[in-house]
A protein has these predicted regions:
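Generic structural signal for buried aliphatic residues
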Residues: 40, 102-103, 160
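A structural motif shared across PLP-dependent enzymes of the aminotransferase-like
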Residues: 106-119
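N-terminal glycine-rich beta->alpha transition that marks the start or flank
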Residues: 33-83
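Mid-domain Rossmann-like dinucleotide-binding core that forms the NAD(H)/NADP(H) cofactor-binding site
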Residues: 134-189
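A glycine-/small-residue-rich N-terminal strand-loop-strand element
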Residues: 57, 83-106, 180-181
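Hydrophobic, low-acid, alpha-helix-prone terminal segments
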Residues: 3-16, 31
Length: 189
């Protein structure tokens, strides 16, 4: 598999997909999305399951069916949160290089490989985190950050109550609120 990836990744990243489409096995179909010059091809090492995935699979609340599909999911590539190693980069990518350990959020995170835009939800994995730990961060942390900073307008000295402080989003909310200098009270069951 690794030799196959090395052989076809440059063609995929430069748009030579027509010559290679039949050479890519079914399990590597996500590689075909890597033809963009600003794409980062990630070999996924870990992916986490979060409520978004569960709602997507269950089709509840019913509004999810508009995106997911009425009878069954339209897209079999499930998952959002992931971590892994950069396998290849498009010719215009400057922030990442092959071998970098990264984590982020993108539909299809349960796949073996993902193509992620360089300027999308992708960043270097801290060296002190395992791949599994990093895969648990993206959606929960982004949700907490957006709620506190963007919607809540958090500021130093502000008193903040975090309901559900022991959950996925709540754990990040406590840490993020503290990093903004807020006085935090956490509530959990």
């Amino acid at each position: 598999q690794h030799a196959c990836l090395q052989a076809i990744a440059p063609e995929l990243l430069t748009g030579g997909i027509g010559r290679l489409i039949h050479a890519v096995s079914a399990e590597h179909q996500d590689l075909t999305r890597s033809r963009q010059r600003h794409a980062v091809l990630v070999k996924v090492h870990a992916a986490s399951l979060n409520p978004l995935d569960w709602h997507y699979m269950r089709g509840t609340p019913y509004i999810m069916r508009m995106q997911a599909g009425v009878g069954a999911p339209k897209d079999s590539a499930m998952g959002v949160d992931f971590s892994g190693t950069v396998a290849a980069v498009g010719k215009n990518v400057t922030r990442f290089k092959a071998g970098d350990e990264v984590f982020g959020g993108r539909d299809g995170a349960f796949a073996e490989f993902l193509s992620v835009g360089e300027n999308k939800a992708l960043t270097l994995k801290p060296a002190n985190m395992t791949f599994e730990q990093a895969a648990a961060v993206p959606i929960a942390a982004i949700t907490a950050l957006q709620a506190l900073r963007d919607k809540g307008g958090i500021r130093p000295g502000q008193k903040v109550l975090i309901n559900g402080a022991s959950g996925g989003v709540g754990t990040f909310a406590v840490q993020i609120a503290r990093s903004f200098g807020a006085e935090v009270t956490g509530v959990c069951s």
